């Protein structure tokens, strides 16, 4: 969902403006919104990037909230079914589960944006 003039969605400019720091890579863009009291809240944007071949493994519980678009979360373990989340959906990732997330469907026109809350300093690789 882009602006009427073809510009990026307003949510992007708001999130970028509020971010303490941002970083971009081949798997998306991440901006840290808050890091206090041992908790870090970040926004993640996925728009046509590659799917990360590595698995993410949170050391502690992570909470994801989809703001825009759809997000597919694949789990390494066949015991956990893959999930497709839409705007407004929340997913709790248990500590130690191995997963990866990407925009769904892969050829969607709009970016997927989600918020992630986790313990500060967690890398998950």
Feature locations, PLM:
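A structure-centric signal for secondary-structure junctions around beta-strands
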Residues: 38-40, 60, 109-112
């Amino acid at each position: 969902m882009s602006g009427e003039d073809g510009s990026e969605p307003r949510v992007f400019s708001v999130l970028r403006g509020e971010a303490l720091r941002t970083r971009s890579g081949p798997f998306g863009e991440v901006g840290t919104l808050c890091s206090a009291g041992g908790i870090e809240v970040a926004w993640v944007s996925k728009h046509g990037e590659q799917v990360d071949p590595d698995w993410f493994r949170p050391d502690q519980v992570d909470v994801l909230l989809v703001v825009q678009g759809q997000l597919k979360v694949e789990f390494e373990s066949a015991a956990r079914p893959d999930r497709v989340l839409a705007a407004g959906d929340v997913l709790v990732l248990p500590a130690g589960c191995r997963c990866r997330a990407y925009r769904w469907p892969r050829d969607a026109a709009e970016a997927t944006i989600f918020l992630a809350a986790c313990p500060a300093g967690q890398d998950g690789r």
